[in-house]
Amino acid sequence: MNSRRQHRTTTKLRPRHRTARFALALLVTGLLASAWSHAAAAQQPLQKLLVLDFELIDQQADVVPFPEKEARLAMASQRLREALVKQELYDVIDIAPVAQLIRTEAARQSLLECNGCELDIAREAGADRILLAWVQKISNLILNINVKILDAKTGQVVMTNSVDLRGNTDQSWQRGIDFMVRDMVEKNEGNR
């Protein structure tokens, strides 16, 4: 009788073992496919990305002074460029060769709404993609950081991202940019 009970127990466990082996095989296959796709992506050359400086959309500009505006926008632009390079999301190219063209266009209008002038700037710089970045300031407490990446040839939007901030400080802006880049890494949004 004891051997019969043992046989039943063994028989009951066998389907579980098959299911576990099947699940393990699926897991290993998935991991190998993921590793292969990451390796293939790593072998592709990085897209050349021109990162324009942050612009500020400030709905209270006439009412609430923001004396550190220029310094904070410059800090944010530099931090974003460095983070994209560090994470190897793009080949961020130097903005200096097109700085005069950028100044000329920016003096006429916002580069966020210039009807394609940003694409001309990107092509002049030899970029595959261009990143437009802006901070929308609702108040000193409520802000958001936004980025949009466009294909320099077609103008097609290839990625957008936005992060809400609470507080208008260097630290909140830095954390927002760090979060945005980390989110891009986690979602595999680089090199698009």
List each language-model region with its residue ranges.
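N-terminal secretory signal peptides that target proteins for export/translocation
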Residues: 1-18
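Bacterial N-terminal signal peptides
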Residues: 23-35
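Sec/Tat signal peptide C-region and signal peptidase I cleavage site
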Residues: 36-42
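C-terminal/domain-edge helix-coil "capping" segments
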Residues: 42-61, 77-83, 87-90, 115, ...
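N-terminal segment of the mature soluble domain
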Residues: 66-113
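Surface-exposed patches in mature extracellular/periplasmic domains of secreted proteins
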Residues: 95, 134-135
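Conserved acidic residues
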Residues: 128
